[in-house]
């Protein structure tokens, strides 16, 4: 599997061979589905909550006598059919998160990388190590790579780089991805995946031995 390699300025240098251990794994749609579903579930706060009739304040007194009024019998003003009453079968706080095995996560990551490579959506760039905040420079890099206005760009770099992270944060279509904390959502939900050389080497160590 081949990919285009670019300089720090975004100029095309050559075409390189991508590591087969990372980009030629068998596609596992089921693994991608389970990994994405788990990540989506883990993002949910689960803070939704309604009050049942036992939680609503008031309503302890019977509103009127059982007999003799001519009206329907009522036991509480907080019954569900009353205005201001409790909710029946409403949502309660809950934890939606769940875990998937590390083996499944590895398989999902490799499947996504392989799918991206087949679609020619993987680009390799020389290591980016800015010494100052400069959004304009990175906007120019993506423009030179002909990626501007092509959709979301996933920029996969090694570790945390504050200058780099905050510089690209001002570009709406660029998603900063730390190679030490890769999520399937980050590498899947983009049009192009730009990987630095250092990040590629680190991924090879982390995911290359897994199948």
From Swiss-Prot:
Residues 46-55 have a biased composition (Polar residues). Part of the 50S ribosomal subunit. Residues 46-89 are annotated as: Disordered. SUPFAM superfamilies: Ribosomal protein L4. NCBIfam families: rplD_bact. One of its GO terms (cellular component) is ribosome. Belongs to the universal ribosomal protein uL4 family. It comes from Leptospira interrogans serogroup Icterohaemorrhagiae serovar Lai (strain 56601). One of the primary rRNA binding proteins, this protein initially binds near the 5'-end of the 23S rRNA. It is important during the early stages of 50S assembly. It makes multiple contacts with different domains of the 23S rRNA in the assembled 50S subunit and ribosome. One of its GO terms (biological process) is translation. The keyword Ribonucleoprotein applies. GO terms for molecular function: rRNA binding; structural constituent of ribosome. Pfam families: Ribosomal_L4 (PF00573). Keywords: Ribonucleoprotein, Ribosomal protein, RNA-binding, rRNA-binding. The keyword RNA-binding applies. This is Large ribosomal subunit protein uL4. It comes from the Bacteria. PANTHER family: 50S RIBOSOMAL PROTEIN L4, LARGE RIBOSOMAL SUBUNIT PROTEIN UL4M.
């Amino acid at each position: 599997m081949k990919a285009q390699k670019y300089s720090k300025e975004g100029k095309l240098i050559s075409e390189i061979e991508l590591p087969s251990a990372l980009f030629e794994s068998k596609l596992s749609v089921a693994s991608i589905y389970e990994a994405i579903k788990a990540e989506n579930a883990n993002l949910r706060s689960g803070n939704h909550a309604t009050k049942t009739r036992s939680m609503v304040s008031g309503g302890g007194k019977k509103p009127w006598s059982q007999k003799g009024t001519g009206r329907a019998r009522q036991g509480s003003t907080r019954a569900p059919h009353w205005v201001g009453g409790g909710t029946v079968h409403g949502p309660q706080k809950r934890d939606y998160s769940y875990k998937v095995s590390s083996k499944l996560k590895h398989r999902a990551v490799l499947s996504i990388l392989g799918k991206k490579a087949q679609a020619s959506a993987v680009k390799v760039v020389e290591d980016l190590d800015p010494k100052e905040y400069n959004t304009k420079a990175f906007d120019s890099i993506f423009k030179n790579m002909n990626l501007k206005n092509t959709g979301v760009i996933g920029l996969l770099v090694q570790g945390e780089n504050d200058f780099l992270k905050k510089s690209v944060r001002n570009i709406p279509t660029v998603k900063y991805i730390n190679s030490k904390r890769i999520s399937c959502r980050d590498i899947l939900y983009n049009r192009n995946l730009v990987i630095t050389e250092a990040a590629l080497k680190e991924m090879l160590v982390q995911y290359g031995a897994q199948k």
